[in-house]
Amino acid sequence: MSILDRKEIFRVEESSLTFEKLVNEAAPEISSGLREKSVVILPSHGHDDVFYAGTLDTLDFLNENGINTDVYASDEEYKELSLHGAEFWLGIFIIQSIVVPVFCGVISSYIYDKLKAKDDDNIALKFMVENKEGKTTAIEFHGKVENLSKAIDAVKSLSDED
C-alpha cells in the first residue's frame, strides 16, 4: 500500500474543548476577538501555533460567505506549515451548532469550487461542533473527497435546527 492509498479515517467522538474554554485559555489579544465568532480555526498537525498552508484563504472564504470566523492566533504568532503531497489539509474547525447548516454549504463550496478538489483527491480535516448546551462532538475525516459527504452529513446531524 502506498502512502497515497492509505486507509480512510472517519471518527466521531466526544471532545472536552468548548468555545468558552478556548476564550478563557487564550491570551487577551486573542480571546477578545473570539467572543463573537461562530467558527474558530485551530492550530493543526500537533502544534500549538502552526496552521496548514492556505488557512488564511479558508478564513477569508468563510468570512466572505457570511460565516463569522477567526484563527486561534494573534497576527504575530500566526505561522503556516506547508505539507507537500497529493492531499488537501484543511485543518481543525470548532463550530457553534447554530451555524452548522450554513457552514456545511460554504465549506463544501470551498472544497469543490475554490480548491477544485476531485473525487479521487485525498482530504484531511476535523470539525468540532459545540451544541447550545456546551457539549462538543468531533468529526475527523482523512480520505477520498468522494467519501467526504459522510463527514459533512455527520456535522449536519449536530445542527441545532430541527
Residue ranges and their predicted role:
Residues 67-71, 98-100, 155-157:
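Short, surface-exposed, polar/charged, turn-prone segments marking secondary-structure boundaries
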Residues 2-74, 131-132, 138-139, 145-148:
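Membrane-active, amphipathic/fusogenic segments and juxtamembrane/transmembrane anchors
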Residues 110-162:
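Amphipathic, membrane-active segments
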Residues 54-56, 84-86, 151-156:
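Surface-exposed beta-strand edges and their flanking turn/coil or helix-capping segments
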Residues 71-78, 162:
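Short glycine-rich, low-complexity/disordered patches
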Residues 76-126:
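Membrane-inserting effector segments that mediate pore formation, membrane fusion
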